[in-house]
């Protein structure tokens, strides 16, 4: 637990304030939070709908100018590491593969999408975020966002900002 933060998780636990699905934040009003932090969450949503829906929900609950701090396994980095047979033995490469596809220790520990900087930025922009910035680390919590394999950080950490104002719809053309 960290003061000032509320924790949502799909599974109950001692540090969990809200049990639920991060794709449906209907329990929270629009513009409820100045910041949303999600470390190694997005890869658990399918790329064909749920991922974008989750990002739109997170956008909805942020105040104008709010920041989404996201960390995901960096598919480009993991793919590069997986191919380094001279550096990692088969067991180590198997663990890298698990970082790509999930540990499969329970029904929720499965990765349904791989994200790199380009893919993640596209999803964030499609959800309405602007000014997507890559950051070396978030430093908010001791979690997987700081994970390294060998000496290589494996997480893609970004901040994405909700615009201060939403562009008004254009008026209908006069007849």
Predicted regions located by residue number:
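Conserved SAM/SAH-binding beta-strand->alpha-helix loop
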Residues: 11
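A short SAM/SAH-binding and catalytic strip from SAM-dependent methyltransferases
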Residues: 34-49
